[in-house]
A protein has these predicted regions:
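N-terminal presequence-like segments and the immediate start of the first folded domain
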Residues: 1-86, 92-145
Length: 145
């Protein structure tokens, strides 16, 4: 079963409660926590290759875009949308390159995920299973009851 392509989320568009402790500085580009109720979708680690397992991009922003498109495709198969994502863990092979590329990564994010920012962590790793991969992202989504 193939689902229609999901549209990016609008600002503040989430069926879940964003958790922000009183007095904490507002995070930029992520949430400190999310509360959700419904059917859970677990998206295994996605990397920046296309549906034929071919890398079309060899730079981090390009691979992030493809990785996020892959996540949206998996979500769509479960009738989930970007705004249903409650948490993501990013694994990057070069945190300095990640920091240098934030502007381009932000554009890739908005093109695929919109203005929905779930709870997230970014972890630098020494390598990923696929030698060409520069990023791998796991996601969890909750589709409301």
């Amino acid at each position: 079963m193939s689902a229609a392509k999901a549209r990016p989320a609008e600002a503040g568009e989430t069926p879940h409660r964003v958790i922000q402790p009183a007095g904490w500085a507002k995070p930029i580009g992520y949430a400190n926590g999310m509360e959700a109720r419904g059917r859970t979708v677990f998206v295994g680690g996605q990397i920046g290759w296309n549906a034929q397992c071919t890398f079309e991009s060899h730079d981090l922003p390009g691979q992030v875009l493809q990785t996020l498109e892959n996540i949206v495709a998996v979500l769509a198969e479960a009738n989930a949308r970007p705004e249903h994502v409650t948490t993501m863990t990013w694994f990057v092979t070069d945190r300095k390159e990640y920091s240098r590329s934030l502007k381009e990564i932000g554009r890739a994010w908005k093109a695929t995920m919109g203005r929905h920012y779930p709870a997230m962590a970014v972890v630098e790793v020494s390598g990923l299973v696929e030698d060409e991969a520069l990023v791998e992202i796991q996601a969890t989504a909750v589709i409301p009851d």
